[in-house]
Amino acid sequence: TEATTKYFLTQAAASAVLLFASTTNAWTTGTWDITQLTNNPACIMLTMALSMKLGLAPLHFWLPEVLQGIPLNTALIITTWQKLAPISLLYMTHNAIHPPILLTMGILSTLVGGWGGLNQTQTRKIMAFSSVAHLGWMASVTTINPNILLINLFLYIIMTTTAFMMLIYTSSKTIKDLTTSWMISPPTTAMMLILLMSLGGLPPLTGFVPKWVILQELTTNHLSMTATIMALSALLSLFFYLRIAYTSTLTTFPTTTQNTNKWRFLPKSNTTVISLMLLPSILILPMTPMLML
């Protein structure tokens, strides 16, 4: 399909740039160890390659289009599991990464992720821009404290997985579909409101933890302006999360009184996994000191 081709070409191009960075460094220094890059052009190429693989702005062009062209199950894998390999490389090579470029991309990603999601009606594209914004927060702290990157990744995967599982359970591909999700599963729809607020970063929910820790780390390292811009950009993301929450839980799609409530007649489905994933997605804030050890 078109989405598959876009994903393959983008990842192949990024892998080629990554290999070229390693080759360039080996040519000038004589070592093939990618974690010890000392050649400046190779460091820049490595940063750009990993940014393209992750979908950081301005190299995020492929992510919304790819997610829009694939099923929700596959979109879940691409936004979570497929981020592990490039972020592992980012963690291992954080000493060789070009800090100003990565920090700039981090700020751009939070802004683009917020702005891009404002006018979207497709849930997959909204989750794509949400992913771009979250990755921007991760990128901004990578060269300062890579351990915070891992905490952020862990929480991001939990929250995004839960959100996609809820969308899959209610078969919601557009915001319009969310208006009828209450007929499929009222409890799931009610919990989706809290989960979306967590993704938006509202305290006292889990999503507040990475934003709080990252802003604290940036301020400690005298990057107050960067922290301010990123905190303001979080309001953009929060707006479209609120819009989805309002549509899904506080509005009712026009129906007749004879309309059947699907949840009464649907066979009982197992929501144990969603329930187990939902708990850490909204209740990890009190455990923050333990995560920071």
Which role fits each region the language model picked out?
Residues 1-293:
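Core, highly hydrophobic multi-pass alpha-helical transmembrane subunits of bioenergetic inner membranes
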